[in-house]
Amino acid sequence: DKSLLRKYESISYDVDEIYQDTKNLLQLEAVACKDWLTNKVDRCVGGKVAKQQCAGSLQLPLNDVGVMALDFQGKSGIATSIGHAVASALIDERAGSKNAIAEALTNIIWAPLKEGLQSVSLSANWMWPCRNEGEDARLYNAVEAVSDFSIALGINVPTGKDSLSMKQKYADEEVIAPGTVIISAAGECSDIKKVVEPVFQLVENNSIYYIDFSEDEFHLGGSSFAQIRNGIGENTPSINDAAYFKKCFNAVQELINKDLLLAGHDISAGGMLTTLLEMCFAENNLGADIHLDGFDEKDPTKILFSEKSGIIIQTAKGIEVDEILTSHDIS
């Protein structure tokens, strides 16, 4: 096979339309509430479901990680999560692979893992339209990126599956599916009672932190925002430094183990704005006052809608949190 260079146009938008863009964004299936799916199934069958989909007083399906207890009396469990970055992979298949892993990890991060990041094992489910020009080369690059990124993080990918005939033929045309990898993550949870939920808590003197895991720019390519603007985007964010990502992950694990977090949520579909909104949705009479002055990026649209890997945390112990983040060289 041969490599093909595919270029997509950058996203055009008007900052003054941010409120309408938000309304449109929240109606996308990838972003909108999933209660149509979760509310029709038993979410606690067997009695060992320690953390199911729903959170908060309003029981909205917002939790990033699922946790099953190992027995009825102990505090150990198994944490699971998934991640994907389909549109991101259209722009850059290597970035798409790393973003899929990053999403799975920033989902499972809210459960205290016995050995931190080293506790995690991944499964890769490949869905790709092979035997079409350029796609075999893209698949090779994507698989190599998963391998390299996982090795750099010190985690394994012992299993997976593939569907490599993702093309539908008609009488006069063909439609190929976008090459996609779905990453599943699993690890041993050391204390099922310490799992952090994405629901802001009404306490005095609390602080909200944004932690950037990617060290990339606030690109809009491959985002849900790009979709509502009828585009894909020219550039997609990636993970620039696996070592820094690993430091961020283990720092958050330390915060969880020391009971320093009130709430936490990853940034994925919909970007930072969706993350902040979701953390307010699950309780009555709850809101947040957010200032974007501390960002080097001055375009609020990019800050709020970019889906580069990162998390939002809430704490009432800012001094202790600052000390731990500083000790891990996280700014």
List each model region and its residues.
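Glycine/proline-enriched, intrinsically flexible loops and inter-domain linkers
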Residues: 1-331
